Amino acid sequence: MAQSNLRPLHDRVVVRRVESESKTAGGIIIPDTAKEKPQEGEIIAVGSGARDEAGKLVPLDVKAGDRILFGKWSGTEVKLNGEDLLIMKEADIMGIIG
């Protein structure tokens, strides 16, 4: 997993989805076609922040390396160097894990 050379603008972040287990606690293997897309990911790049009404730059609350939860339909899917990534606004992030 090479570091992305994509730098998001403003209050956007680049997220790599964290895959869920493909086997249940009871040992049943879940096929890829039945799995939902994970709503958990790791931030790999952050923008510089948004500007407030006075024009002052407000930095983001998240940083590269944070594990986050986001909505099922959040972000825009992009493929970069063969890797599926999401670009989303900080407002689409529901929380930081850990």
Curated annotation (Swiss-Prot):
Main location: cytoplasm
Pfam family, one: Cpn10
Entry similarity comment: Belongs to the GroES chaperonin family.
Keyword Repeat part of the UniProt annotation: no
Quaternary structure and partners: Heptamer of 7 subunits arranged in a ring. Interacts with the chaperonin GroEL.
Tree of life domain: Bacteria
Cellular localisation: Cytoplasm
Keywords: Chaperone, Cytoplasm
Keyword Aminoacyl-tRNA synthetase: no
GO cellular component: cytoplasm
Protein name (database record): Co-chaperonin GroES 3
Molecular function GO terms recorded: ATP binding; metal ion binding; protein folding chaperone; protein-folding chaperone binding; unfolded protein binding
Function: Together with the chaperonin GroEL, plays an essential role in assisting protein folding. The GroEL-GroES system forms a nano-cage that allows encapsulation of the non-native substrate proteins and provides a physical environment optimized to promote and accelerate protein folding. GroES binds to the apical surface of the GroEL ring, thereby capping the opening of the GroEL channel.
Gene3D superfamilies xref list: GroES chaperonin
Naturally occurring in which organism (per UniProt): Mesorhizobium japonicum (strain LMG 29417 / CECT 9101 / MAFF 303099)
Cysteine-cysteine disulfides: none
Any one Gene Ontology BP term: chaperone cofactor-dependent protein refolding
